[in-house]
Amino acid sequence: MRFKISLTTRLSLIFSAVMLTVWWLSSFILISTLNDYFDNQDRDFLTGKLQLTEEFLKTETFRNKTDIKSLSEKINDAMVGHNGLFISIKNMENEKIVELYAKNSVVPAVLLNKSGDILDYMIQTEENNTVYRSISRRVAVTPEQGKSKHVIITVATDTGYHTLLMDKLSTWLFWFNIGLVFISVFLGWLTTRIGLKPLREMTSLASSMTVHSLDQRLNPDLAPPEISETMQEFNNMFDRLEGAFRKLSDFSSDIAHELRTPVSNLMMQTQFALAKERDVSHYREILFANLEELKRLSRMTSDMLFLARSEHGLLRLDKHDVDLAAELNELRELFEPLADETGKTITVEGEGVVAGDSDMLRRAFSNLLSNAIKYSPDNTCTAIHLERDSDCVNVMITNTMSGQVPANLERLFDRFYRADSSRFYNTEGAGLGLSITRSIIHAHGGELSAEQQGREIVFKVRLLMD
């Protein structure tokens, strides 16, 4: 089984790693900066003492021990307050002329050896766990100041104080970084827990969601922007889920109602036939009545299977150019006898050719026209208007409603939907005609909608020409 790391742990580790990396880099920069600072400080200090000693050489002679002693006293006075400072003056034969250093100090080897090979550069040496920095310079003297024309001045200093300070600072930073590991992990965990609180709320809501609590929603306003969008989409998902569940509940209720009537009729007629012996004509009438109910059940089953295939994209369309005006005129002629009985008329205007399955489109428009005639008042006109657009053909079917116009016209296309409890729309059918019509139009890549214009209802069909 694959080991999974929680998001809280991941973010905590990432937070800790970033925080520690930044602090360790800061510590490294601090140490490097201090080292550079002490390095420059020592260089300036040694250079200053070197120049001071050079000035003394220009003003003093050292032909005898008295001169050398006087020079040593001047240089020694300049060393007051500078513990760890070493000054050496040698001739070119590496013979010592002056050598001054603090009491109880170990003379560094850099003063004992000839340093003429490295001039005017600060060098660093380590002896007996002590680090020394030194600068040597060759200085010209006048002939009367000695036998040699040049001498070598070497100035060195003990960096023990700096080294001790840096060691203490490094030790402190080391232990601080160790403690920072635990602090970073804790702060990372705490910050992540606070930041992921909206996600835990989403998880809690999802785990507590049941069919009886589909109306629960999250509040995106209380979440950060990065999560509020996700929470809003989460709420949208619940809206779709609630809508789908409501449709499923309505569908289950409606299909039970639709099946109950024919099944009850079949049972009553069968019980009536079995109640006593009857002649052949009575049995024939009962069988014909049962046959009508069975046909109704068969049509309902076929319609349900058609809708199921449509929803799963299994409808096979035999597409070719379809003259909508011709098809609608044929339907007009087909429905005219039914419309004439109540003084209703049907008109078709416009033209348009689309790519589609003529049988499927004929069925879709037949359902729309049938509903328009069935639910319009007597002596009214059902108008069909075709209008060509840039890449499509729009078909508008307008008729006057005989009753109250449904409040939510879009739900007319739902399965078994009734506009009100009195089953205003499609009362004689199974309530699947408009659902089938919508499925056919969508299968052709078109759109179907309904809108109210006063007492009239307009069904708009949009079909692509190609």
UniProtKB/Swiss-Prot annotation:
Domain Histidine kinase as annotated: residue spans: 254-466
A GO MF label: phosphorelay sensor kinase activity
UniProt catalytic activity: ATP + protein L-histidine = ADP + protein N-phospho-L-histidine
Post-translational modification Phosphohistidine, affected residues: 257
The keyword Cell division appears for this protein: no
Keyword match Hydrolase: no
One annotated Gene Ontology cellular component of this protein: plasma membrane
SMART domains reported for this sequence: HAMP, HATPase_c, HisKA
SUPFAM superfamilies: ATPase domain of HSP90 chaperone/DNA topoisomerase II/histidine kinase, Homodimeric domain of signal transducing histidine kinase
Enzyme class: transferase
Domain annotation HAMP: ranges: 193-246
Location in or out of the cell: Cell inner membrane
Cytoplasmic side: 1-10, 193-466
Chief subcellular location: membrane
EC number: 2.7.13.3
Spans through the membrane: 11-31, 172-192
Keyword annotations from UniProtKB, A to Z: ATP-binding, Cell inner membrane, Cell membrane, Copper, Kinase, Membrane, Nucleotide-binding, Phosphoprotein, Plasmid, Transferase, Transmembrane, Transmembrane helix, Two-component regulatory system
NCBIfam families, alphabetized: cztS_silS_copS
Function according to Swiss-Prot or TrEMBL: Probable member of a two-component regulatory system PcoS/PcoR. May activate PcoR by phosphorylation.
Protein name (database record): Probable sensor protein PcoS
Organism of this sequence: Escherichia coli
